[in-house]
Regions:
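N-terminal subdomain of nucleotide-sugar transferases
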Residues: 1-44, 50-56, 82-85, 110
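Active-site proximal beta-strand in glycosyltransferases
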Residues: 3, 89, 106-143, 171, ...
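A conserved mid-protein helix/loop that constitutes part of the nucleotide-sugar donor-binding site
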Residues: 19, 23, 243, 247-266
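Carbohydrate-associated surface elements
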Residues: 41, 176, 199
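A short, charged, and often flexible helix/loop element on the N-terminal side
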Residues: 52-82, 140-152
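Short His-centered aromatic/hydrophobic patch
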Residues: 92-98, 118
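Membrane-proximal helix-turn-helix segments that form the acceptor-binding/catalytic region
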Residues: 122, 138-170
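Acidic anion/phosphate-binding donor-loop and adjacent secondary structure
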Residues: 182, 200-231
Length: 282
């Protein structure tokens, strides 16, 4: 089967969607499928995977508006790809690609059935920005992406609605995400939808190998770097008095990092040896 994935994020543009698409494409290719990724251009080359080809298209470098320009160029690339090698399924990752209902219908009628993955909605993102502002998160008005979401989410939501109305099936990454789309966009009761929960790579996220000396030395080095290295922590025991709280993600207001930081004094009252480590870009 030839699967064309339209994804606004793909390595080296790492993000939630980019990570999902990278690993999903690799696994689908390993099962014997051919996967073509149509994504936004980037100055660095994407990592190679057997059975996966990457097609880069230009896009307008403006918050929110890029989703529309990228979709238009992705459609051109999809048409060209289909002429060269027939596509069996088109997998669109929403909300980073804004296709109109007319464009969705064209793909369905002239290229292949569409599976739209629902990673989240712009209206939901807007609510996240508003909640962040109410919680006094930092830079809610200074971050151009958050500001654009706050001001234009309603306009761009029509493209998401087009996706769930015109796709052969819509697949959400959680029941809450699916309920969010039903709440905001009110599709027909019989609209074709499903929920597939994303897993994790068990080769990466796994219990520690305590027989691997190099791994244990790295573990000890990290714990000592962040001053959370009592004997229980070094031996992975829950009785540790120096627990590490690890937060990983983009450093934007709607992720709630300032709320987490403000919570630390209360955490330290009960766990004085606790340490908070935040990793991300923003």
């Amino acid at each position: 089967m030839h699967i064309a994935m339209i994804a606004g994020e793909y390595p080296p543009r790492w993000g939630g969607i980019g990570s999902v698409v990278f690993h999903l494409a690799g696994h689908l290719a390993a099962c014997g499928n051919k996967v073509s990724i149509i994504t936004r251009s980037h100055k660095d080359k994407p990592p190679e995977q057997s059975g996966v080809s990457v097609i880069e298209v230009p896009w307008l470098k403006l918050p929110m508006a890029f989703t529309r320009s990228y979709a238009k160029n992705a459609l051109k690339a999809l048409k060209n790809l289909h002429r060269k090698e027939e596509v069996d399924v088109v997998h669109i990752h929403l909300p980073l690609a804004s296709f109109s209902r007319k464009q969705f219908r064209f793909i369905e009628q002239n290229i292949a059935p569409i599976c739209s993955s629902l990673h989240g909605s712009w209206l939901g993102e807007k609510q996240g920005v508003i909640r962040a502002s109410n919680a006094k998160e930092s830079a809610t008005w200074r971050n151009p992406n958050d500001l654009a979401i706050r001001l234009t989410a309603k306009y761009y939501s029509k493209f998401e609605r087009a996706g769930i109305l015109e796709s052969s099936i819509s697949v959400a990454n959680s029941h809450s995400t699916l309920n969010e789309f039903k709440k905001w966009y009110q599709p027909a009761d019989d609209f074709n939808s499903d929920v597939v929960l994303w897993g994790c790579d068990h080769k990466v996220f796994r219990p520690p190998n305590q027989d691997d000396e190099e791994e244990q030395l790295n573990h000890e080095k990290i714990r000592k770097r962040y001053d959370c290295s009592d004997e229980f922590a070094l031996s992975y025991q829950p009785e540790t008095q120096t627990p590490m709280i690890l937060a990983v993600g983009r450093l934007v207001a709607r992720k709630g990092y300032m709320t987490l930081i403000r919570a630390m004094p209360k955490i330290l009252e009960q766990h004085p040896g606790a340490r908070l480590v935040i990793i991300g870009r923003g």
